[in-house]
Regions:
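Phosphate/NTP-binding elements of NTP-utilizing enzymes
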Residues: 1-99
């Protein structure tokens, strides 16, 4: 599964959300196999193959694909509808949540 956390202005809030996700995986006994943290590209991969990244939601966020997305509530509806929602691809499980 691939997940993306989309944020508007606060990278720190998006990283807090990623830390929540990391804790959930730790409770399921999945270890981290790759961890890359930078302001422009934060990526984490777990031992079960799941992949999470943090992306800023703007006009340049096109071209990504994921099965699940966490979307910051402050992001404009037009960006959500035209840019973020098309990135969510159907698999056996698909979803999005606002945080």
């Amino acid at each position: 599964m691939k997940g993306i956390i989309f944020y508007k202005n606060s990278y720190e809030k998006a990283f807090e959300k990623l830390e929540e996700i990391i804790n959930n995986y730790k409770e399921l006994n999945y270890s981290i196999t790759q961890y890359k943290k930078s302001r422009l590209d934060t990526v984490i991969t777990f031992s079960n193959g799941d992949y999470w990244q943090i992306k800023k939601a703007n006009e340049h966020s096109r071209g990504f694909a994921c099965n699940i997305a966490y979307i910051e509530r402050e992001i404009e509806k037009a960006i959500v509808d035209t840019i973020i929602m098309p990135t969510i691809k159907a698999k056996t499980y698909t979803g999005f949540n606002f945080w």
